[in-house]
Amino acid sequence: MAKSSADDEELRRACEAAIEGTKQSIVMSIRVAKSRGVWGKSGKLGRQMAKPRVLALSVKSKGPRKKAFLRVMKYSSGGVLEPAKMYKLKHLSKVEVITNDPSGCTFTLGFDNLRSQSVAPPQWTMRNTDDRNRLLVCILNICKDVLGRLPKVVGIDIVEMALWAKDNTPVVTTQRSTEDGEPVAESVTESDLKVTVEKELVSQAEEEDMEALLGTYVMGIGEAEAFSERLKRELQALEAANVHAILESEPLVDEVLNGLEAATNIVDDMDEWLGIFNIKLRHMREDIESIETRNNKLEMQSVNNKALIEELDKVIERLRVPSEYAASLTGGSFDEADMLQNIEACEWLAKALRGLEVPNLDPIYANMRAVKEKRAELEKLKATFVRRASEFLRNYFASLVDFMVSDKSYFSQRGQLKRPDHADLRYKCRTYARLLQHLKGLDKNCLGPLRKAYCSSLNLLLRREAREFANELRASTKVSRNPTVWLEGSTGSSQNANTDTSAVSDAYAKMLTIFIPLLVDESSFFAHFMCFEVPALAPPGGAGNDKKSQSNNDDGNDDDDLGIMDIDETDKKPGKNSPDLTALNESLQDLLDGIQEDFYAVVDWAYKIDPLRCISMHGITERYLSGQKADAAGFVRLLLGDLESRVSMQFSRFVDEACHQIERNERNVRQMGVLPYIPRFAALATRMEQYIQGQSRDLVDQAYTKFVSIMFVTLEKIAQQDPKYADILLLENYAAFQNSLYDLANVVPTLAKFYHQASEAYEQACTRHISMIIYYQFERLFQFAKKIEDFMYTITPEEIPFQLGLSKVELRKMLKSSLSGVDKSIAAMYKKLQKNLASEELLPSLWDKCKKEFLDKYESFVQLVAKVYPSENVPGVTEMRGLLASM
């Protein structure tokens, strides 16, 4: 027999080399063939060809514990073994010998930790059954020794495996050296080489029991086949004896069958009787159910009748109209003493109408004739009450206002300004505030005529109060008029310019202080009294009022707390997009329309006395306008906006007239010196700055811009009428403008801008005038220098002396005529500068500018001569500067 690969030491060493460094030792290594196919009926391999592999069993000691592994080795391209896969034997769950292989040399190993159980495990085919048994016995011994358990074995008898292991344990001869170096042979079993397998597959006790059993049959432990045949023969004998015993008991069986047939007949009879009883019971149950159904219907009908009677009682109670409420709604009085009863009747009527509407009333009742008739009756009551209440309130509003208008003590009189007091009027109206709330709930359309009646009546009162107050306010304000002609050419027009006219703006402020809060209060009262759904208003005496308005408040103002929230504490506050807002603004237009004429009259009166007071009035109006934020004060905002426009229009009229006064200077005869409107504008600007209040700065700055623009344009036009003296006129007037506005320009940005503009124009006029004077006295000198400069652009300085008119001789002639008696020429230049100058205070600064300009031009001339005529002597700049300084 060929030697097994399990005994191949070279193979073992190759496996140890392949797992070197893993601290594992090889127990057994053996060559196998790996395949994935199955053995068919023909005995040939299936899908894949077998691949040569080596299975190696290894163990690893870690303290007292041991771990066992099954390694699969494959051959590399160079024929060297290398690890392919490794399985832990602790996961080995099944060892199955393939029955389709007739040789019995193919088996599979099942592991319970493989990821894909759907893939068939590889099949391992050994060379012969001895190699197969040798490998499997080694695996089972290691599992039992190391793991303490055996995997499931399928396809082979484990007893046969144990018997094979006992008979085929190989003896391996090893050599060891003695002390003298001679080898000595020693015999050990394979199981003693690496792992001690003292625990066998079948225990000693089991083997002794098996020998005792076989001994009873006078057989040895190795005669298993004979023992099996003997057991089969005994089993067949026992089965034959059982059949014989059954045949002997046939009479007994017949007797039992007869008894069973009699019992079956009795059972059939009982079943028939039970069927009869069941039919009778079913009929009885049907009768009982019929009786119960009729009884239940009667009970339900009784309950329904009772509930129906209760519901009808409720409906009748709901449809009943109390006599006291019917009397109040159809013919009751609207006196103050009876208002509580009227309110209760209104509340009952509104509740009754809501109760007959579908959401609050069952839809079944809504179509009943009695309900329809009662609803029609309630609608008739509602229409009657709304008509009576509306007629009463219209007459009541008219009578209240007529009473107040007929009493002159309510209005301002000669020598006595009276603040309008509507506390009593509002108190009387508040008596009917809740009535209006209920009228709105009953019929919204009835409020339109009531609002118009209230607005019409109260408008008469407000216009009368404003007219009387404005007339007395103008009559009681004593102040002399300021001139409206500020910038005219006449000298006497500004003599009264400093008259104190503050009483005018105070009167206007007083008019606003008294009437703007009154109009806001009236708007607020009207919005809530007439049930407009708008947001709450600011309280009276808001942002637009000053201390003076607070000091004028008398005790009657305590009644201005109208108690609007007391009308209906559950009144909601809708947003600013309320649909009532448009209707409210239209009603406020009717309420307050026409009162603006009296405010316009005060503005026009103030303008006639002092146009500049428009500045103060503009600031006062702007302050009140910024304080009106509430929606119900919409008309008051419009009124203040119109007043602001009126004030701005009057002030613009004043500005336009003043501009026309400035432009009229242009048509005068030749003018010299400072024009009269220059210093007068400074006085006007000073006065305007004193009147600025609040947001009036933009208005004043616009006026400044228009004034100064016209002034500068007119000045330029006047100067162009006489070009000979134009620069003198310009520099004198621009200097006067700067001098008169120096202080204001430091604090007013708009005037500062024009101040810098005038400064630039002054410098330009000075430069032109001084250049003219210098050229007048030294014309030949600087014309000669101009010719030299012109030639220097085209030829070299050395060639210039050879040009016509620029020779050295010509230079000497020119110097002699221009610089001989230069002191006289300079004195003449000073006299000419002084001759036409009306403002003597400008002469020193102009003369300094003139000397500086002359020295600069002369220095340029000397430098040109030094370049072109280096050998010629010219008086130096230092000499000329000394001469100018001595004069």
UniProtKB/Swiss-Prot annotation:
Residues 542-581 are annotated as: Disordered. The keyword Disulfide bond does not apply. InterPro entries: Sec3-PIP2_bind, Sec3_C, Sec3_CC. GO terms for cellular component: cytoskeleton; cytosol; exocyst; extracellular exosome; phragmoplast; plasma membrane. Widely expressed. Preferentially expressed in tissues containing dividing and expanding cells, such as the shoot apical meristem, root tip, lateral root primordia and developing embryos. One of its GO terms (biological process) is exocytosis. Residues 221-248, 281-301 form a coiled coil. It is a peripheral membrane protein. Disruption phenotype: Embryonic lethality. Pfam families: Sec3-PIP2_bind, Sec3_C-term, Sec3_CC. It comes from the Eukaryota. Keywords: Cell membrane, Coiled coil, Cytoplasm, Cytoskeleton, Exocytosis, Membrane, Secreted, Transport. The keyword Cytoplasm applies. Residues 555-569 have a biased composition (Acidic residues). It is found in: Cytoplasm, Cytosol; Cell membrane; Cytoplasm, Cytoskeleton, Phragmoplast; Secreted, Extracellular exosome. The exocyst complex is composed of SEC3, SEC5, SEC6, SEC8, SEC10, EXO70A1 and EXO84B. Interacts with EXO70A1, SEC5A and ICR1, but not with ICR2. Binds to EXO70H1. Binds directly to B1L. Component of the exocyst complex involved in the docking of exocytic vesicles with fusion sites on the plasma membrane during regulated or polarized secretion. Involved in polarized cell growth and organ morphogenesis. During cytokinesis, involved in cell plate initiation, cell plate maturation and formation of new primary cell wall. During cytokinesis, involved in cell plate initiation, cell plate maturation and formation of new primary cell wall. Belongs to the SEC3 family. This is Exocyst complex component SEC3A. It comes from Arabidopsis thaliana (Mouse-ear cress).
